[in-house]
């Protein structure tokens, strides 16, 4: 996935510039070790889309669900701590690179919602019903921590309904705003991209 040029058809340069000066919003659709990031202006124009790395090369992307299975709880906890530290370094670097390349300051980041009372104890995380979600939650927490460290607001969204929520906010503009990027920017424009853009709209 590559970053894109601003999507500004139908808007004057002064209006686009004013919207960008107001700040841009980032929507994230994360996976294990990487994420799709879509950045939009206050007027919901896509100014950047890219894949970002959330973990360093060579580190296990899903320690709880896979790599820690043969380990005892103490060894599993050490492995998860190493992976989390790697994720923090990689995510910080990815977000700093993103922020440095944008035409305006980032004001918020939108992330998929996760249970805020998710257990911290690794021994508990290794048991059902937590083990299938623990690694994903770790990435959410790392992304959130990185955003707060940079002074960005953090918004949480539900992946199943965020597109409908965005359409409700946009009203008659929904088809144009949500459908235009695929036509004007070309591939890649996947479900992850649509969800990420919708999340920035709901956060605005």
Predicted regions and their residues:
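Phosphate- and other anionic-substrate recognition elements at nucleic-acid/protein interfaces
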Residues: 1-4, 17-204
